[in-house]
Amino acid sequence: MSKTDNRLMTFLRPSDKNLDAAKFSENLSSQNVLDFGNVNAMVVRTSNDNKYWIIGLSNGTIVLLSTEDSEKQTNNFYTLNADGETLPCSDLQPVPELNGQIRDNCHLILAVYVSGHARLWHYTGAMNSSRLLATITEERISNPSDAPVRTNAENVMNQILSCSCSYDGKRFVTGGVDCHLRVYDMKSRRRLRMCSSSFTKEKMDGHVMRICAVKYHPRGAVYEDYVHIFITGGWDDTIQIWDDRYLHSLWIYYGPHICGSDALEIESESNHILSSSWRRDKSILQVWKFNEELMIEFYNSAEHQGDELSIPTGREIINKQTGALYYCKPVAEIPQDAYDGPSKGYVAKWLGPYYIAFGGSDANILKLISRFTLNFMSAIFKIPGIFIGS
């Protein structure tokens, strides 16, 4: 792996004039800042072994920066570039290691792009040719509500906005502008199935607008019953629960307008969903109870057809949405702060057992919030640019 051109990014100290606009609460300070110039950082993750920051940029480049004394190793970073890719890397995730085992020869990253490509990278490969393991191309699928497409038009690519890997490392899901979720086999890179709405007036069992966030349930790392379960959120003001073996969603929470891949997350121990809505609602964060009873109903009703699940006619009890009064409203909400000004949410993160992170635009703020009191503990205000990911 060779080092890239140092002009790609610049390390800034907190005293630099570019950072004067950002304001830190008294109990928070900054060691350094990365400046990518006119290129925006769309998504930031850490590798499974915590040795690298993995940063997806708006020009399609992925940067890997060492987490070890990074302020002293200003040239210790690498890039992953696909030939001809110039559109944003909208989301990425390190592929979970099977059985939680970290192996040096399995440093894989799944990355998706607005260009309609999903790529699997082996980021410790010695050469560019050995790092890019696979490229998957998604064509946009027309929905009943879409405008008619001209017959002589070229194939339109799906803008992929989000992705997630199952915790057994065997599958991954992508979501984007065309409202369909594609489930792939990690080993063969073959598409297993397409999950979507029925697009009927009788029921809503899938997304009808773009999908901006996809998250596999973290309990899938331990419990077999959860290994196929994931949640999604999008522009249609819904959060939806899915099983990647079934064609339609199982449950829907109404309300949050999800606009970022980091605006939705599940906490394993409490089994609570955390969401952040991109609009000036009364609350910046919402906490929802995951519908465990739904899973019991679903598994008792579903029949196996190969590697898919189906619900026999007359036994579609999951669509009754039993217990709606308990599950349709948030169990907790964190209100907007009148002092800071309204903020539209892009980021909702569980940070261990004690904290929650929120990030949003308009006020351009990042907040650290106590899970017990729901009061904010520290914050960065007036971050330059638009805060869209973490």
Regions found by a protein language model. Name each.
Residues M1-S390:
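WD40-repeat beta-propeller superdomains and closely related acidic/aromatic-rich repeat-like regions
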